[in-house]
Amino acid sequence: STGRTVANNLNEQLAMKEVMSNPLENATKVPLKNGMTDPRWLGTDGWVKMQRVIPTSDGNITIHFNYNEITGVFDDFKFK
């Protein structure tokens, strides 16, 4: 598992809250060479890796998450 789930500062807390409240707004798919292979989120079951980049005065905050294009479910939000 790469990335972390705990915010280091207020900007990160606010960015995570924003992303979790509306994950697909300005989100893009993260290209994966072999697709989603983690057994918890298999690409064959509809899962894709997504990211949002939130600009702040201190630089960008990037958050990755998993999205199931079939069910519309989101999971595994992490700071990158």
Model-derived segments and spans:
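Catalytic toxin/effector domains delivered as secreted proteins or via bacterial secretion systems
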Residues: 1-80
